[in-house]
A protein has these predicted regions:
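Short capping/connector residues at structural and topological boundaries
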Residues: 20, 49, 128-129, 156, ...
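Acidic/histidine-enriched, glycine/proline-rich intrinsically disordered or flexible terminal extensions
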Residues: 178-193
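GST-like fold's C-terminal all-alpha helical module
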Residues: 70, 74-167
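Short, flexible loop/turn segments with low-complexity composition
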Residues: 65-70, 173-182
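GST-like domain detector, emphasizing the conserved glutathione-binding G-site
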Residues: 1-108, 115
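A generic structural-conservation signal
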Residues: 12, 127, 152, 174-175
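A short hydrophobic/aromatic micro-motif that marks alpha-helical segments and, especially, helix-coil
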Residues: 61, 148, 183-184
Protein backbone atom coordinates (compact mmCIF):
# COMPACT_ATOMS: atom_id res chain seq x y z
CA UNK A 1 0.00 0.00 0.00
CA UNK A 2 2.88 2.38 0.75
CA UNK A 3 4.26 1.95 -2.77
CA UNK A 4 0.89 2.79 -4.29
CA UNK A 5 0.37 5.69 -1.88
CA UNK A 6 3.81 7.15 -2.67
CA UNK A 7 3.36 6.40 -6.37
CA UNK A 8 6.57 4.36 -6.56
CA UNK A 9 6.85 2.41 -9.82
CA UNK A 10 8.62 -0.91 -9.52
CA UNK A 11 9.26 -4.28 -11.16
CA UNK A 12 6.98 -6.86 -9.54
CA UNK A 13 7.98 -10.51 -9.30
CA UNK A 14 5.26 -12.71 -7.83
CA UNK A 15 6.68 -15.91 -6.31
CA UNK A 16 5.46 -18.99 -4.50
CA UNK A 17 7.03 -19.22 -1.06
CA UNK A 18 7.09 -23.01 -1.29
CA UNK A 19 9.14 -22.70 -4.51
CA UNK A 20 11.39 -19.69 -3.93
CA UNK A 21 13.55 -18.81 -6.92
CA UNK A 22 17.33 -18.70 -6.54
CA UNK A 23 17.26 -15.06 -7.62
CA UNK A 24 15.44 -14.18 -4.39
CA UNK A 25 18.40 -15.51 -2.39
CA UNK A 26 20.85 -13.65 -4.61
CA UNK A 27 19.06 -10.41 -3.73
CA UNK A 28 18.51 -11.17 -0.03
CA UNK A 29 20.03 -14.07 1.89
CA UNK A 30 16.93 -14.12 4.12
CA UNK A 31 14.81 -15.38 1.24
CA UNK A 32 11.71 -13.70 2.64
CA UNK A 33 9.22 -11.36 1.03
CA UNK A 34 8.80 -8.56 0.40
CA UNK A 35 12.21 -7.52 -0.87
CA UNK A 36 12.90 -4.24 -2.63
CA UNK A 37 16.11 -3.83 -4.62
CA UNK A 38 16.76 -0.21 -5.51
CA UNK A 39 18.38 0.98 -8.73
CA UNK A 40 21.61 1.73 -6.83
CA UNK A 41 21.74 -1.90 -5.61
CA UNK A 42 20.53 -1.20 -2.07
CA UNK A 43 18.33 -4.02 -0.76
CA UNK A 44 15.50 -3.41 1.70
CA UNK A 45 14.07 -6.69 3.01
CA UNK A 46 11.79 -5.67 5.87
CA UNK A 47 8.20 -4.62 5.14
CA UNK A 48 8.22 -1.65 7.49
CA UNK A 49 11.56 -0.43 6.12
CA UNK A 50 10.14 -0.60 2.59
CA UNK A 51 7.11 1.40 3.72
CA UNK A 52 9.28 4.02 5.42
CA UNK A 53 11.53 4.28 2.36
CA UNK A 54 8.48 4.86 0.14
CA UNK A 55 7.16 7.55 2.44
CA UNK A 56 10.54 9.31 2.46
CA UNK A 57 10.26 9.51 -1.32
CA UNK A 58 6.74 10.93 -1.36
CA UNK A 59 4.51 11.39 1.69
CA UNK A 60 1.49 13.04 0.08
CA UNK A 61 -0.76 13.15 3.15
CA UNK A 62 1.77 13.16 5.98
CA UNK A 63 1.38 9.51 7.00
CA UNK A 64 4.47 9.60 9.17
CA UNK A 65 4.70 13.22 10.28
CA UNK A 66 2.45 12.95 13.36
CA UNK A 67 3.09 10.77 16.41
CA UNK A 68 6.30 9.42 14.88
CA UNK A 69 7.52 7.82 18.12
CA UNK A 70 4.15 6.30 18.97
CA UNK A 71 3.75 4.90 15.46
CA UNK A 72 7.18 3.29 15.68
CA UNK A 73 6.27 1.79 19.07
CA UNK A 74 3.02 0.32 17.71
CA UNK A 75 4.80 -1.11 14.66
CA UNK A 76 7.62 -2.62 16.73
CA UNK A 77 5.12 -4.13 19.16
CA UNK A 78 3.20 -5.58 16.23
CA UNK A 79 6.27 -7.06 14.55
CA UNK A 80 7.63 -8.62 17.73
CA UNK A 81 4.87 -9.48 20.19
CA UNK A 82 1.60 -9.48 18.23
CA UNK A 83 2.97 -11.38 15.24
CA UNK A 84 4.38 -14.06 17.55
CA UNK A 85 0.92 -14.78 19.00
CA UNK A 86 -0.87 -14.26 15.70
CA UNK A 87 1.19 -17.00 14.02
CA UNK A 88 0.29 -19.41 16.81
CA UNK A 89 -3.36 -18.39 16.70
CA UNK A 90 -3.57 -18.89 12.93
CA UNK A 91 -1.60 -22.14 12.95
CA UNK A 92 -2.64 -23.49 16.36
CA UNK A 93 -2.55 -27.07 15.03
CA UNK A 94 1.22 -26.73 14.52
CA UNK A 95 1.83 -25.09 17.90
CA UNK A 96 0.53 -27.74 20.26
CA UNK A 97 2.34 -26.45 23.37
CA UNK A 98 -0.73 -24.29 24.10
CA UNK A 99 -4.43 -24.43 23.28
CA UNK A 100 -6.28 -22.50 20.59
CA UNK A 101 -8.05 -20.62 23.39
CA UNK A 102 -4.72 -19.55 24.92
CA UNK A 103 -3.52 -18.19 21.58
CA UNK A 104 -6.83 -16.45 20.97
CA UNK A 105 -6.62 -14.85 24.44
CA UNK A 106 -3.11 -13.52 23.74
CA UNK A 107 -4.21 -12.05 20.39
CA UNK A 108 -7.33 -10.66 22.04
CA UNK A 109 -5.22 -8.54 24.43
CA UNK A 110 -3.81 -6.60 21.47
CA UNK A 111 -7.13 -6.36 19.66
CA UNK A 112 -8.83 -4.93 22.76
CA UNK A 113 -6.28 -2.08 22.84
CA UNK A 114 -6.78 -1.28 19.17
CA UNK A 115 -10.56 -1.47 19.51
CA UNK A 116 -10.49 0.98 22.45
CA UNK A 117 -8.41 3.46 20.45
CA UNK A 118 -10.77 3.17 17.48
CA UNK A 119 -13.83 3.77 19.64
CA UNK A 120 -12.47 7.31 20.09
CA UNK A 121 -10.63 7.82 16.78
CA UNK A 122 -11.28 7.29 13.10
CA UNK A 123 -7.78 5.81 12.68
CA UNK A 124 -5.14 4.51 15.10
CA UNK A 125 -3.37 7.89 15.36
CA UNK A 126 -6.45 10.08 15.18
CA UNK A 127 -8.46 11.62 12.37
CA UNK A 128 -6.35 10.59 9.38
CA UNK A 129 -4.78 7.48 7.95
CA UNK A 130 -1.15 7.02 8.94
CA UNK A 131 1.67 4.56 8.41
CA UNK A 132 0.71 2.56 11.50
CA UNK A 133 -2.76 1.83 10.07
CA UNK A 134 -1.24 0.48 6.88
CA UNK A 135 1.51 -1.43 8.70
CA UNK A 136 -0.88 -3.16 11.12
CA UNK A 137 -3.79 -3.72 8.74
CA UNK A 138 -2.51 -6.99 7.14
CA UNK A 139 -1.92 -8.55 10.56
CA UNK A 140 -5.27 -7.49 11.98
CA UNK A 141 -6.91 -8.75 8.79
CA UNK A 142 -5.25 -12.14 9.33
CA UNK A 143 -6.41 -12.22 12.94
CA UNK A 144 -9.96 -11.38 11.88
CA UNK A 145 -10.05 -14.18 9.31
CA UNK A 146 -9.28 -16.90 11.85
CA UNK A 147 -12.76 -16.45 13.35
CA UNK A 148 -14.65 -13.64 11.63
CA UNK A 149 -17.73 -13.94 13.84
CA UNK A 150 -15.72 -13.75 17.07
CA UNK A 151 -13.72 -10.81 15.74
CA UNK A 152 -16.76 -8.81 14.57
CA UNK A 153 -18.70 -9.43 17.77
CA UNK A 154 -15.89 -8.56 20.18
CA UNK A 155 -14.18 -5.72 18.32
CA UNK A 156 -16.81 -3.64 16.50
CA UNK A 157 -14.73 -0.47 16.17
CA UNK A 158 -11.72 -2.45 14.95
CA UNK A 159 -13.97 -4.37 12.53
CA UNK A 160 -15.31 -1.11 11.12
CA UNK A 161 -11.76 0.26 10.75
CA UNK A 162 -10.64 -2.92 8.97
CA UNK A 163 -13.62 -2.87 6.62
CA UNK A 164 -13.02 0.81 5.85
CA UNK A 165 -9.44 0.00 4.84
CA UNK A 166 -10.41 -3.11 2.86
CA UNK A 167 -12.82 -1.14 0.67
CA UNK A 168 -10.55 1.89 0.28
CA UNK A 169 -9.44 2.76 -3.26
CA UNK A 170 -5.82 2.47 -2.11
CA UNK A 171 -6.23 -1.09 -0.83
CA UNK A 172 -8.33 -2.19 -3.80
CA UNK A 173 -5.69 -0.80 -6.18
CA UNK A 174 -3.04 -3.17 -4.80
CA UNK A 175 -5.13 -6.34 -4.74
CA UNK A 176 -4.45 -7.24 -8.36
CA UNK A 177 -3.44 -10.86 -8.91
CA UNK A 178 -0.16 -11.38 -10.74
CA UNK A 179 1.10 -14.40 -12.62
CA UNK A 180 3.88 -16.31 -10.93
CA UNK A 181 7.24 -15.04 -12.12
CA UNK A 182 9.44 -17.59 -13.80
CA UNK A 183 13.10 -17.32 -12.93
CA UNK A 184 14.10 -16.68 -16.54
CA UNK A 185 12.38 -13.40 -17.38
CA UNK A 186 11.62 -9.91 -16.27
CA UNK A 187 8.91 -9.04 -13.81
CA UNK A 188 5.88 -6.84 -14.45
CA UNK A 189 6.37 -3.08 -14.29
CA UNK A 190 3.81 -1.58 -11.91
CA UNK A 191 3.13 2.14 -12.25
CA UNK A 192 0.78 4.08 -10.00
CA UNK A 193 -1.21 7.04 -11.28
Amino acid sequence: MAMAYSKISYEHREILLKNRPKDLYRISKKGTVPVLKLVDGTVIDESVDIMKWCIKQNDLDGWFEDNYTLQNRFIKNNDTEFKYWLDRYKYHIRYIENSYEKYQKEVEAFLIKYNLILQENYFLMGKKLSLVDVALMPFIRQAAHVDIGWFAQNFPALSEWLEKLKVSPLFLSIMKKYDIWDDSGEGIIVKWQ
